[in-house]
Amino acid sequence: DSNPIIKVEFRAEYLTRCGYIEAIQRVELFLKKLIPEYEIKISEIHLCADVQGHEFNLLDTYKFKTNSRSTKLFESKDDKLSYLNNNVFTGFSMGNGDYMLRVYNKTHEIEKFKNKSYIKPLKWDINPKYNPNKTVWRIETQIRRNKLKTIVGDNGILDGFDVVLDAIPDLWAMSMEQ
């Protein structure tokens, strides 16, 4: 694919505040005013879930079955993200580039980076099941365009904008099975 004429990147905070459907509608409304005809291609999609009740640890990395050859383990040392240094376990990732799964301590991340704390009042605090005394872990999958356009969903190859959006539940399920 050639470089796009217009590239839109949604920031996590923006998506948290308005949701992906409203964000997309706003972009489409804007584009229609500028360009009468256009085609939208998704270059990358991130799907995530925040969970409580399980404290991930180093042993969990061995419980995951994966086709990936790349697994990175992270620990926190002096508030710097580094590879295993016999300190506090803060997460791991599997895969790289076009297809990746990350599991990380979101509570630790927002304590370390205050600009990411928007998630707490916007989502966690309003969830009756949220326990502020327990750690929140984020499970996140990242799928880039090169991988997306090799996946066949119910509505065909995940190359078109609407096809990818319709396949979000299937992409999440597929990510958890990989």
What is each model feature region?
Residues 1-178:
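Structured, helix-rich domain cores that form ligand/interaction pockets
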